[in-house]
Amino acid sequence: METESAAASGESFTSVTSKKTRKRRAAEERPMDTGEQPSKRPDFPPISGDKLMGDKDEMRKVPVPSHRYTPLKENWMKIFTPIVEHLQLQVRFNLKTRNVEIKTCKETTDVGALTKATDFVRAFILGFQVEDALALVRLDDLFLESFEVTDVKPLKGDHLSRAIGRIAGKGGKTKFTIENVTRTRIVLADSKIHILGSFQNIKMARTAICNLILGSPPSKVYGNIRAVASRAADRF
């Protein structure tokens, strides 16, 4: 009798499952989503050059010192042509302010054209040949670096003159050798030194010039830069 009542009461029991078990079963029964998931990062189409620059035209001014007026006048067409035809910019020489003014226009499509043209004109004003400065327009990995002899070593009077003479060499031989080995262009303007080239080549030329200023003999400097240049060539 007691066993029958226990059996009857046992039929009314319900099994209780935990919350974790219910979640796991629901996840197993749910079909696996193998479709392409939408990316969380926004995907915007590239903006064209004219929209990026906006309606307002940008302008840069490059000051021209008095000793560069004549070279600028003689080489004006060589400077004017690539800026207008290749970079699609407007350029003029303001006689009142003595500045070369470069301006964007409706035809300008390249966002970096204004910077390239400014670097090109600035390189010519510093003393580089038009053909050498034009490389700044054609190539993207070229830079200009300027420093003074006194930045390396505080020299004065005859000591400063001798340091500049060591950099130039007899008939410009030392300067030409550094240019050829490091594939750079160097301008010596009084105590200022301007180097045009790629980042790695500028570094090699700058190291050689600094060693000459600090008093190293040219023969030792030649050997060092040739060794560095050959290692760089083997690396690439």
Swiss-Prot record:
<comment type="function">
    <text>Part of the small subunit (SSU) processome, first precursor of the small eukaryotic ribosomal subunit. During the assembly of the SSU processome in the nucleolus, many ribosome biogenesis factors, an RNA chaperone and ribosomal proteins associate with the nascent pre-rRNA and work in concert to generate RNA folding, modifications, rearrangements and cleavage as well as targeted degradation of pre-ribosomal RNA by the RNA exosome. Positively regulates dimethylation of two adjacent adenosines in the loop of a conserved hairpin near the 3'-end of 18S rRNA.</text>
</comment>
<dbReference type="InterPro" id="IPR036612">
    <property type="entry name" value="KH_dom_type_1_sf"/>
</dbReference>
<keyword id="KW-0539">Nucleus</keyword>
<dbReference type="GO" id="GO:0005730">
    <property type="term" value="C:nucleolus"/>
</dbReference>
<keyword id="KW-0694">RNA-binding</keyword>
<dbReference type="GO" id="GO:0003723">
    <property type="term" value="F:RNA binding"/>
</dbReference>
<feature type="domain" description="KH">
    <location>
        <begin position="152"/>
        <end position="209"/>
    </location>
</feature>
<comment type="similarity">
    <text>Belongs to the PNO1 family.</text>
</comment>
<comment type="subunit">
    <text>Part of the small subunit (SSU) processome, composed of more than 70 proteins and the RNA chaperone small nucleolar RNA (snoRNA) U3.</text>
</comment>
<feature type="compositionally biased region" description="Basic and acidic residues">
    <location>
        <begin position="26"/>
        <end position="43"/>
    </location>
</feature>
<protein>
    <recommendedName>
        <fullName>RNA-binding protein PNO1</fullName>
    </recommendedName>
</protein>
<dbReference type="InterPro" id="IPR041174">
    <property type="entry name" value="KRR1-like_KH1"/>
</dbReference>
<dbReference type="InterPro" id="IPR055212">
    <property type="entry name" value="KH-I_PNO1_first"/>
</dbReference>
<dbReference type="GO" id="GO:0032040">
    <property type="term" value="C:small-subunit processome"/>
</dbReference>
<dbReference type="GO" id="GO:0042274">
    <property type="term" value="P:ribosomal small subunit biogenesis"/>
</dbReference>
<dbReference type="Pfam" id="PF17903">
    <property type="entry name" value="KH_KRR1_1st"/>
</dbReference>
<dbReference type="InterPro" id="IPR004087">
    <property type="entry name" value="KH_dom"/>
</dbReference>
<feature type="region of interest" description="Disordered">
    <location>
        <begin position="1"/>
        <end position="59"/>
    </location>
</feature>
<dbReference type="Pfam" id="PF22891">
    <property type="entry name" value="KH_PNO1_2nd"/>
</dbReference>
<dbReference type="InterPro" id="IPR055211">
    <property type="entry name" value="KH_PNO1_2nd"/>
</dbReference>
